[in-house]
Amino acid sequence: MLFWTAFSMALSLRLALARSSIERGSTASDPQGDLLFLLDSSASVSHYEFSRVREFVGQLVATMSFGPGALRASLVHVGSQPHTEFTFDQYSSGQAIQDAIRVAPQRMGDTNTGLALAYAKEQLFAEEAGARPGVPKVLVWVTDGGSSDPVGPPMQELKDLGVTIFIVSTGRGNLLELLAAASAPAEKHLHFVDVDDLPIIARELRGSITDAMQPQQLHASEVLSSGFRLSWPPLLTADSGYYVLELVPSGKLATTRRQQLPGNATSWTWTDLDPDTDYEVSLLPESNVHLLRPQHVRVRTLQEEAGPERIVISHARPRSLRVSWAPALGPDSALGYHVQLGPLQGGSLERVEVPAGQNSTTVQGLTPCTTYLVTVTAAFRSGRQRALSAKACTASGARTRAPQSMRPEAGPREP
């Protein structure tokens, strides 16, 4: 009797441990990751605005959990040269981080955001800056909307490395540029708000940051028309097992793609996919040491990136032109359009931004009886652009010309 009692207890203990291992592999844990704040500290920001931004960032981190096994934070200033206020491993408590933010001085200088983003990329992955391998990376850029140098290429490099980008703009800025820079979807990762109203978005943004830091979820990012990036937490090590990734187009089991990855992998990018298609993705951890459940996510690729194919000029007046184009792309396909007019003989450029879903605009402030090169550029979430150009001439009098389909000067191009 004693033998069966001991055997029953041992069996119950083994079953309990197995259940515990499975549950530990599939339930949520505390957020863990490296959080970098990139603040516009240049002379384009007033001292009052900078003080309000500091208060806002302090409010964001107030209820977050910081420590070696939780979140870590760093602050980098945008100026003529990037400057680190504190590194990821400099402070281990939320209160110490708040105190450091509260006394951070404004650096002034030019707004070289592109330079600061390249610097931030190094900081996010440098162990000497306290960054940790294999944890989620989040960058929060607070800006007045302007930059003295390009931000698109360094932002894309960060996103290609799996960094989640949140942008808070307290000024007007370039809408299309900011939409392309932020992680998708834009409604979750991009905020336009007056500097005095920053506290209004603090709770929502804090929740979004925390969601991005959750380590237990397989998730997709950088979704394009031909592929997307998958990321997951470090569930295994190189010595404890491996992963199998499965990719199944909706309703097409026969075309399942599989990829085996080492146990220390935390990301993979699928390419050569079909546009506007649903894919079921499964991450299967294989290990003799840990019992971990598969993780699943559904991802839909974007529609194909097709730029304008025809430009129509109408209502040609001495100081204005109406520009139309086809096809018209909706918000699901493009971020929007740039319409630019420049005199062929040289002179100032006129530029208009048009939201996705519209395919015409009237450009004002032109010179009478002048030939212009009209360029319509479609901007996509991938950061790519496609453009088409045509010639147009303003009228010498007040007479309106009938619409004419213009022969393109150049085929669709990708700047």
Curated annotation (Swiss-Prot):
This is von Willebrand factor A domain-containing protein 1. Residues 34-209 form the VWFA domain. Glycans are attached at residue 264. The keyword Signal applies. PANTHER family: COLLAGEN ALPHA, VON WILLEBRAND FACTOR A DOMAIN-CONTAINING PROTEIN 1. N-glycosylated. The gene is Vwa1. Keywords: Basement membrane, Disulfide bond, Extracellular matrix, Glycoprotein, Phosphoprotein, Repeat, Secreted, Signal. The keyword Protein transport does not apply. It comes from Mus musculus (Mouse).
